[in-house]
């Protein structure tokens, strides 16, 4: 929770830009998720735990959309506004189902309270059809995010740019592994969402502080080198080694 909050503060302190805006929204969603999960962990009644779960879903329903808007903007792929609004509408419908889940069995087929051996109570939530609809959206969204980050970040640009792209890629890859493990039922009493969002925030923090993820001047300089129509090769004359080739130089 504190790591996600720190990431929100660091992103908010960066120079305003398209990437900064959507990365901030992504990390605000991550912070909401971790706060909701923490409140559920310490809840003493079923009603309090259910309210905390609903709070966490406010972040869960929006984090993927904001992450996609960030990565498409960062890699200059671009995202169709109609697709973004369609995803927002879809997530709003699912969020409405979560907020009223005790009145129907669409998102959760059943809701009960379970006492663990350690004396802590947890919610037992049997997954409904809309839960799987949300999980499918998350998996497709994360795969799309990873593909865009891999193509536009990891495999493109200078060494530092590739390291930055790798961190952006890992910010989604590790959470999807945890989500798949959870969906497979290996740890039914352990919700990996908080761990996944924390890993994501750590990756973004390192990318920002170490590799200038939101440094507008540095990113602009790199894109000038990459987008120029002339071939550019930077060589270390002491070690007789090529340090950088822009895309045009690679085709020569």
List where the protein language model places each region.
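Alpha-helical transmembrane segments of multipass membrane proteins
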Residues: 8-9, 35-38, 70, 176-180, ...
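Alpha-helical transmembrane segments
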Residues: 6-10, 146-149, 205-211
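Interfacial "cap-and-anchor" motif at the non-cytosolic start of specific transmembrane alpha-helices
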Residues: 25, 152, 158-226, 233-235
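PAS/LOV sensory domain surfaces, especially short acidic/polar patches at coil-to-helix junctions
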Residues: 239-251
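Alpha-helical transmembrane segments of multi-pass integral membrane proteins
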Residues: 12-36, 53-55, 125-183
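Sensory-domain cores of signal-transduction modules, predominantly PAS/LOV
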Residues: 230-233, 241
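Juxtamembrane membrane-water interface segments that cap and precede transmembrane helices
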Residues: 113-130
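Individual alpha-helical transmembrane segments in multi-pass integral membrane proteins
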Residues: 1-4, 15-106, 130-140, 191-200
């Amino acid at each position: 929770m504190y790591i996600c909050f720190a990431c929100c503060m660091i992103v908010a302190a960066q120079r305003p830009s398209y990437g900064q805006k959507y990365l901030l929204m992504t990390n605000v969603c991550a912070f909401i998720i971790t706060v909701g999960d923490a409140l559920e962990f310490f809840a003493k009644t079923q009603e309090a735990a259910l309210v905390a779960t609903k709070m966490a879903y406010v972040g869960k329903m929006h984090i993927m959309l904001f992450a996609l808007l960030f990565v498409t903007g960062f890699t200059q792929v671009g995202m169709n506004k109609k697709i973004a609004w369609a995803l927002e509408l879809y997530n709003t419908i699912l969020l409405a189902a979560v907020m009223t889940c005790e009145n129907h069995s669409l998102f959760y087929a059943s809701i009960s309270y379970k006492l663990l051996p350690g004396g802590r109570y947890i919610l037992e939530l049997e997954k409904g059809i809309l839960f799987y609809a949300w999980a499918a959206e998350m998996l497709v969204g994360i795969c799309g995010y990873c593909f865009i980050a891999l193509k536009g970040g990891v495999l493109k640009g200078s060494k530092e740019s590739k390291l930055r792209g790798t961190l952006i890629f890992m910010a989604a890859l590790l959470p999807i592994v945890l989500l798949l493990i959870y969906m497979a039922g290996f740890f039914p009493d352990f919700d990996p969402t908080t761990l996944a969002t924390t890993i994501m925030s750590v990756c973004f923090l390192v990318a920002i502080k170490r590799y200038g993820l939101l440094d507008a001047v540095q990113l602009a300089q790199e894109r000038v080198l990459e987008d120029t129509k002339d071939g550019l090769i930077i060589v270390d004359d002491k070690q007789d080694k090529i340090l950088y080739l822009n895309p045009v130089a690679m085709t020569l």
